[in-house]
């Protein structure tokens, strides 16, 4: 029976290309896919598909290492990371490597080590990818049955799913261990303007952790994106890691239920479509997280959020005009509302002007000035610290706007290129990639369902009408 595994099924999808181009048995005649269909030619060659995936991982890790070293080589310690267009070093700094109080970089050596480790890893992966693509067995089922599979073997597929879930759970726990035992992580909320600290009092209460999932996604609630303390983030990773590992063990030990066997399409392309859908959702969530959240993505490294820059400008001008003698509690703005401060519909004291729409911003430099009913007028008059003024002035001039039209009142330069923040890059790139992955999901899901239903043939290439028509010239 094992020989059945390596029989190459001719897929019922016909493709246009030179069918005579042969590549070591991976040609159109034997696979049903032309060279440009990429890994589709390897659908039933588990050994070669392994090579493609390992080589792909090598490319990813090589990019990470090379880009990491590139950022280290160009890094200027005197400037904030977000002014230097960095997208990798902020992640390392957030994990607590190389930074001290206020997010100041005190040691770039950990960043160098990270880059070199990724480069070395990519060499190992690259070698493995080339080996399995060119020299290793075409199929794994005969020689290494543990690593072999048949796409329609539902039990094997859920076992592979379980292994992946366990690996994801271990990844979540790596962050937990870093935060608890290996030096801690950067906490933007640490007193005095942020510092690296070990997390000692994890939030493990299910009502708090899962309460985030039940929140509305809109302003003031903000779903999981509203998380604003590290205890909740690390505690959430404990829950997530545990669920992934337990779910992985469950999927390894069990077989799919009858309803799942009936409801799902069990083919390689179907699994690809499911994966693309999941990554698409993650991309959209990551977009919102990096755009709005300044705890998981500290503003010291990624630059301020849009609402944060807008509120920082209101705060900066409040400080300036208060010093010049303005009564910031009662001054009227051009619309008749408060120029510096006003009340929200619920009675909370908030910044006036166009930034009123960002009333629900929470930021480490602003929270000490709040009282039980919003911004506290007496604290604004007596308690503003120099570091809060410096930080808000800095954030006001580094809004993540790019070329947005609606800027929350932030002053922008008409005839110059405005500063572009890594927050803008990370948010927009994840949104665009999330969208394209969603389109890829629709495409592959449609093909997988059609193939499962047995009606995907494509055009008959031997008798299509165009062959009998006269040449254009």
Swiss-Prot record:
Record GO terms (molecular function): chlorophyll binding; electron transporter, transferring electrons within the cyclic electron transport pathway of photosynthesis activity; metal ion binding
Single GO BP term: photosynthetic electron transport in photosystem II
Gene3D superfamilies: photosystem ii from thermosynechococcus elongatus (1.10.10.670)
InterPro entries xref list: PS_antenna-like, PS_II_antenna-like_sf, PSII_PsbC, PSII_PsbC_sf
Alphabetized UniProt keyword annotations: Acetylation, Chlorophyll, Chloroplast, Chromophore, Manganese, Membrane, Metal-binding, Phosphoprotein, Photosynthesis, Photosystem II, Plastid, Thylakoid, Transmembrane, Transmembrane helix
Annotated positions binding [CaMn4O5] cluster: 367
Family: Belongs to the PsbB/PsbC family. PsbC subfamily.
Protein known as: Photosystem II CP43 reaction center protein
Source organism phylogeny: Eukaryota, Viridiplantae, Streptophyta, Embryophyta, Tracheophyta
């Amino acid at each position: 029976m094992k020989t059945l595994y390596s029989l190459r099924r001719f897929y019922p999808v016909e493709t246009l290309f030179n069918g005579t181009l042969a590549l070591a048995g991976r040609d159109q005649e034997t696979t049903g896919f032309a060279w440009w269909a990429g890994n589709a030619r390897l659908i039933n060659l588990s050994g070669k598909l392994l090579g493609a995936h390992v080589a792909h991982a090598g490319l990813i890790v090589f990019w990470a290492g090379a880009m990491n070293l590139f950022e280290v080589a160009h890094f200027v310690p005197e400037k904030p990371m977000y002014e230097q267009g960095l997208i990798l070093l902020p992640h390392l700094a957030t994990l607590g490597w190389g930074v001290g109080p206020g997010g100041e970089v005190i040691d770039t050596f950990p960043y160098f080590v990270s880059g070199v480790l990724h480069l070395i890893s990519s060499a190992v992966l690259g070698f493995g990818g080339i080996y399995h693509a060119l020299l290793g067995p075409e199929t794994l089922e005969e020689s290494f049955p543990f690593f072999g599979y048949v796409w329609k073997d539902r039990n094997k597929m859920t076992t592979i799913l379980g292994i992946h879930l366990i690996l994801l759970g271990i990844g979540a726990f790596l962050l937990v261990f870093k935060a608890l035992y290996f030096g801690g992580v950067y906490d933007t909320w640490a007193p005095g303007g942020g510092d690296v600290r070990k997390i000692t009092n994890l939030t493990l209460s299910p009502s708090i952790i899962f309460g985030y999932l039940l929140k509305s996604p809109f302003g003031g609630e903000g779903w999981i994106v509203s998380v604003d303390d590290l205890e909740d983030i690390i505690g959430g990773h404990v829950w997530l890691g545990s669920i992934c590992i337990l779910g992985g063990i469950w999927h390894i030990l069990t077989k799919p239920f009858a309803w799942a066997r009936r409801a799902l399409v069990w083919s390689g392309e179907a699994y690809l479509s499911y994966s693309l859908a999941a990554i698409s959702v993650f991309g959209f969530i990551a977009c919102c997280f990096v755009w709005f959240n300044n705890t998981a993505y500290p503003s010291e490294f990624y630059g301020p959020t849009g609402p944060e820059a807008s509120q920082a400008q209101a705060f900066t001008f409040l400080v300036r005009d208060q010093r010049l003698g303005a009564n910031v509690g009662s001054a009227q703005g051009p619309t008749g509302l408060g120029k510096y401060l006003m009340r929200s519909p619920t009675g909370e004291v908030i910044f006036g002007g166009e930034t009123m729409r960002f009333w629900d911003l929470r930021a480490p430099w602003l929270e000490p000035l709040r009282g039980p009913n919003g911004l506290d007028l007496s604290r604004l008059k007596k308690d503003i610290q120099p570091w809060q003024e410096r930080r808000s002035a800095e954030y006001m001039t580094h809004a993540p706007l790019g070329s947005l039209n609606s800027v929350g009142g932030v002053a922008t330069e008409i005839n110059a290129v405005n500063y572009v923040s890594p927050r803008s890059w990370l948010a927009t790139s994840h949104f665009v990639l999330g969208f394209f992955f969603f389109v890829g999901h629709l495409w592959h899901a449609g093909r997988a369902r059609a193939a499962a239903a047995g009606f995907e043939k494509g055009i008959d290439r031997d008798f299509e009408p165009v062959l009998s028509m006269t040449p254009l010239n």
